[in-house]
């Protein structure tokens, strides 16, 4: 994501010690890096996930981190893992982050699920921040999908925070059907 105030570029990703490893001690973590020169060079990767996941590419791995920028340059990142959907933030261009992830939603059935006819289905989060000049400026939105209502009922969910990610509104189901359908 690009911070349009200063043109900094922020990226986050999952690092696997050894992809699909079952070796104890191998883990996944979320890393952050930034460029202040249009991508010519990058800062050393910084770990922003305090709780690691497993290296098995599934619900217990930490994955899906995509940054968003707030109106004053805040960096917001959510991702999914064994502890559900979590959030971290930086208010100083990525130099420091919260000391522990903030829980958003338990994602009771995880982010990796089956949908007939698809090789793979993931309900990983997307994080956005309202940068408009309207009344919702600064509101952080996170949406994802999961199968909490049954294995044949994939639904789309959203939550929002109006205080920089300190607290989160109750999770809302977005799709309006009440049937066993995949969204």
What kind of feature is each model-predicted range?
Residues 1, 59-68, 115-128:
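Signature of short aromatic-glycine-proline-rich micro-motifs recurring in repeat-based ectodomains
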Residues 20-28, 80-83, 120, 149-154:
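Short, solvent-exposed loop/turn segments at conserved positions within beta-propeller repeat blades
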Residues 120-147:
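A conserved active-site cap/scaffold subdomain adjacent to cofactor or substrate pockets
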Residues 1-31, 44-64:
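Asp-box/WD-like beta-propeller blade repeats and closely related beta-sheet repeat scaffolds
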Residues 11, 32, 77, 87, ...:
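Hydrophobic strand positions within the blades of repeat-based beta-sheet folds
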Residues 33-55, 83-115, 149, 154-179:
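Asp-box/BNR beta-propeller loop motif
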Residues 5-12, 72-77, 133-142:
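Entry beta-strands of beta-propeller and related beta-repeat scaffolds
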Residues 15-17, 81, 144-148, 176:
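Transmembrane beta-strands of outer-membrane beta-barrel pores
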